[in-house]
């Protein structure tokens, strides 16, 4: 079957729309599917995602589409950009409609709820082994990407040709630099753990701690990410790149980050429900914290920052008490395995 579009993007939120804008601005006919027909109709009429990216026009090569079958028939390249807790559901809806030559890439950051499984495991469970898989990850705020500001990401996958094709599709000399990476596991994990550490950074700043504490938290958060990554077969070097250190620094230090703002609100005294309402969009790190905590416990990996964030979010611990417990931990060598 011939493509009538170069790529189909599933998920018309802020990040899905931003990636679709970048692809279309790069000269690629791009279908953007969303599950709410009214939202898609608004995109068509407004030529803009007024709800999530107001003021940024949609390129002519970006075609909003509310019918999933039509969207999936248009291209064999499918980019999934939905929250991690609905990733499996969206894939299950898509499965009977996928072309036989379909290739699936996702920009979803997180793990499977409750189990802490990697997104690749969810994809394989739903789709089987028939389709090439890939993931893109890195330090990206949707608004900046959509506005054409310089951005860099990494891509890894199960099929070298698919990875190479994605680099060609996404890379733009003017707006988006794309690095190929061979660590499929590491790229998936980085996007989940950084959300947890970003909440921790927000908590720290919300309490009133300064730049010293935030920097220490980011640094030790990177250690936790690397420790967990190595335990599941990732390469430590990956976490010094875009999907590790890059995403971690971005998300922990800039208030465009929902996870950081969520932590700030909690640190200033809001409860979890009020903080989520204040943000007004999905805070991936809330669920990611439980997912990462579950995975770390299952593997016996020590992640003290993650554990304290988990206790604040799910066990009612005060941010101040969590900070005190981190500071009063047993003295250790910086380079120890714990």
From Swiss-Prot:
GO BP, sorted A to Z: carbohydrate metabolic process; glycerol-3-phosphate biosynthetic process; glycerol-3-phosphate catabolic process; glycerophospholipid biosynthetic process
Chief place of localization: cytoplasm
Organism lineage string: Bacteria, Pseudomonadati, Pseudomonadota, Gammaproteobacteria, Alteromonadales
UniProt KW NAD keyword: yes
Function: Catalyzes the reduction of the glycolytic intermediate dihydroxyacetone phosphate (DHAP) to sn-glycerol 3-phosphate (G3P), the key precursor for phospholipid synthesis.
InterPro entries: 6-PGluconate_DH-like_C_sf, 6PGD_dom2, G3P_DH_NAD-dep, G3P_DH_NAD-dep_C, G3P_DH_NAD-dep_N, NAD(P)-bd_dom_sf
CC per GO annotation: cytosol
Gene name linked to the record: gpsA
Listed GO MF terms: glycerol-3-phosphate dehydrogenase [NAD(P)+] activity; NAD binding
Pathway: Membrane lipid metabolism; glycerophospholipid metabolism
Protein name per its UniProtKB record: Glycerol-3-phosphate dehydrogenase [NAD(P)+]
Residues reported to bind sn-glycerol 3-phosphate: 109, 138, 140, 194, 247, 257-259
Family: Belongs to the NAD-dependent glycerol-3-phosphate dehydrogenase family.
Catalytic reaction(s) noted: sn-glycerol 3-phosphate + NAD(+) = dihydroxyacetone phosphate + NADH + H(+); sn-glycerol 3-phosphate + NADP(+) = dihydroxyacetone phosphate + NADPH + H(+)
């Amino acid at each position: 079957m011939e493509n009538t579009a170069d790529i189909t993007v599933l998920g018309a939120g802020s990040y899905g729309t931003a990636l679709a804008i970048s692809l279309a601005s790069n000269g690629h006919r791009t279908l953007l599917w969303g599950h709410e027909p009214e939202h898609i109709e608004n995109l068509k009429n407004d030529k803009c995602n007024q709800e999530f990216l107001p003021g940024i026009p949609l390129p002519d090569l970006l075609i909003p589409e509310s019918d999933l079958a039509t969207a999936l028939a248009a291209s064999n390249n499918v980019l999934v950009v939905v929250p991690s807790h609905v990733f499996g559901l969206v894939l299950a809806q898509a499965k009977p409609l996928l072309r036989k030559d379909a290739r699936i890439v996702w920009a979803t950051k997180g793990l499977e709820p409750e189990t802490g499984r990697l997104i690749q495991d969810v994809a394989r469970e739903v789709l089987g082994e028939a389709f090439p898989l890939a993931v893109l990850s890195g330090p990206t705020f949707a608004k900046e990407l959509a506005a054409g500001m310089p951005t860099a990401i990494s891509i890894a996958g199960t099929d070298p040709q698919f990875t190479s094709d994605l680099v060609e599709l996404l890379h733009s000399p003017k707006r988006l630099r794309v690095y190929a990476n061979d660590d499929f596991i590491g790229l998936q994990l980085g996007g989940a753990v950084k959300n947890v550490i970003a909440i921790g950074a927000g908590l720290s700043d919300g309490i009133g701690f300064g730049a010293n504490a935030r920097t220490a938290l980011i640094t030790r958060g990177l250690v936790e990410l690397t420790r967990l990554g190595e335990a599941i077969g990732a390469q430590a070097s990956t976490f010094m790149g875009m999907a590790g250190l890059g995403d971690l620094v971005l998300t922990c230090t800039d208030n465009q980050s929902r996870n950081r703002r969520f932590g700030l609100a909690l640190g200033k005294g809001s409860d979890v429900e009020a903080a989520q309402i204040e943000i007004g969009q999905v805070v991936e790190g809330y669920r990611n914290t439980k997912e990462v905590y579950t995975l770390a416990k299952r593997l016996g990996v020590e992640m003290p920052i993650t554990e304290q964030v988990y206790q604040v979010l799910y066990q009612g611990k005060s941010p101040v008490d969590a900070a005190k417990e981190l500071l009063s931990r047993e003295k250790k060598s910086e380079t120890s395995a714990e």
